[in-house]
Amino acid sequence: MKMHFCIPVSQQRPDALGGRYVLYSVYLDGFLFCKVRYSQLHRWDEQLRRVFGNCLPPFPPKYYLAMTTAMAEERRDQLERYLQNVTADPRVTRSDVFTEFLTLVQLHTLNITIQNVELAVFLPDGRSIKVEGLTSDTAERVLEVMAHKLGLQPDLVGYFGLFLIQCFPEGKLSVVKKLADFELPYTSLQSSEMENCKIGLRKWYLDPALDSMLMDCRAAGDLLYMQAVQDIEKEWMKPTQAQREELKALQKKENQTKFLELSQEVRHYGYVQLDPCTCNHPEPGCGAQLSIGNNEISCCITLPNGQIQDIAFQMSRVKCWQVTFLGTLLDTDGPQRTLNQNLELRFQYSEDSCQQWFVIYTKQAFFLSSCLKKMISERMTKLTEQSPEMQIEVPEQGRSKKHPSQPSQQKVYFNFLRKGKMKRSEGDYVWDTLMEEGL
């Protein structure tokens, strides 16, 4: 699946020969990922094509004369789409030529040299494990080391991930983003403009039924237990009073197996809870508390008059969604490392032959989108296992073309836009090329 790459900022810089070049600020999941020149990306594309041939998406052509403003904007859009599409092929993202280039540009952007470093990775129970390595170690590498230290079976590592987590004095926490395999945890911490951020290990699946795949591994069971205890403490899970008392009794007895079995019956077990946000349903300006998991978006909505409504949106009825950056980046020579100030995620929902757009205004819009993609991916996997020949129609990411090496037949429906690209149409927003087929 494609990733949330965007290039909202580009700057003209003088070069050593007196000319000028364009430096593109590449963001991933709303955070500054790297700053690169067109020439660097062009050489990288040539290296990738030597390995993967013409199955790669088209790369923006060179211009030998000065570009007009329209041409410069078109190139930026093309580079953005290229990054989104090239990361959709797991063969590419697992390759050395892919990872090595992105490692270097991440380090270069923050002027970080490759050196020994000790990285603290926090477990759900608050303990941290020191991982000795290099500043250039990827999230995939750090996760492998963590798995070895914890005794986690290699075939279960994919059920977990490293996350950027923000902690607050009152004990609350906010999951900011899930680190991609090729991201560098050390640079992610250095580039974050948020206070009290740390790298945390959490399970990365949203179908509670997948717990059964992990229970034969003691280390995996320990991690699930830690996270369930934490989710109750943070009130992400919603046990009844009777369930809470029984869970406390099982916790005192250190009966992890029974604890996790009972947790499966608790409302919102295995869900991810977002920070309080606002939405437009059932009327503009409503407060919302979102929990995502088990193929649904669960919303606890506070109306302006103080009334509470609980609504659950089933993922099977979500037709498409859109993340939009509504703000304007000023002072482009400054750090500008996050796009979390003015974000919205809107999704189209079909119910009773009626389709309606719902809008959520949250700084975690990219992480919310990642969770929606994860639920779609898990549903696809389950359906494929049940019927390998089934053609699956799912909402996900758009603007890509089908290649012979990627036989997956999906309809893909995710997109990211900046405010300047939005159009008005009869009181609502529409987007260019919102829905396209294929990967």
Curated annotation (Swiss-Prot):
<dbReference type="GO" id="GO:0015031">
    <property type="term" value="P:protein transport"/>
</dbReference>
<dbReference type="InterPro" id="IPR036871">
    <property type="entry name" value="PX_dom_sf"/>
</dbReference>
<dbReference type="GO" id="GO:0032991">
    <property type="term" value="C:protein-containing complex"/>
</dbReference>
<dbReference type="GO" id="GO:0035091">
    <property type="term" value="F:phosphatidylinositol binding"/>
</dbReference>
<comment type="similarity">
    <text>Belongs to the sorting nexin family.</text>
</comment>
<dbReference type="InterPro" id="IPR040842">
    <property type="entry name" value="SNX17/31_FERM"/>
</dbReference>
<feature type="domain" description="PX">
    <location>
        <begin position="1"/>
        <end position="109"/>
    </location>
</feature>
<dbReference type="InterPro" id="IPR048763">
    <property type="entry name" value="SNX17-31_FERM_F1"/>
</dbReference>
<dbReference type="InterPro" id="IPR011993">
    <property type="entry name" value="PH-like_dom_sf"/>
</dbReference>
<dbReference type="Pfam" id="PF21273">
    <property type="entry name" value="SNX17-27-31_F1_FERM"/>
</dbReference>
<dbReference type="Pfam" id="PF21271">
    <property type="entry name" value="SNX17-31_F2_FERM"/>
</dbReference>
<feature type="region of interest" description="Disordered">
    <location>
        <begin position="384"/>
        <end position="409"/>
    </location>
</feature>
<comment type="subunit">
    <text>Interacts with CCDC22, CCDC93, VPS26C and VPS35L, associates with the retriever and CCC complexes.</text>
</comment>
<dbReference type="InterPro" id="IPR048767">
    <property type="entry name" value="SNX17-31_FERM_F2"/>
</dbReference>
<protein>
    <recommendedName>
        <fullName>Sorting nexin-31</fullName>
    </recommendedName>
</protein>
<dbReference type="InterPro" id="IPR001683">
    <property type="entry name" value="PX_dom"/>
</dbReference>
<comment type="function">
    <text>May be involved in protein trafficking.</text>
</comment>
<dbReference type="Pfam" id="PF00787">
    <property type="entry name" value="PX"/>
</dbReference>
<keyword id="KW-0813">Transport</keyword>
<keyword id="KW-0653">Protein transport</keyword>
<dbReference type="Pfam" id="PF18116">
    <property type="entry name" value="SNX17_FERM_C"/>
</dbReference>
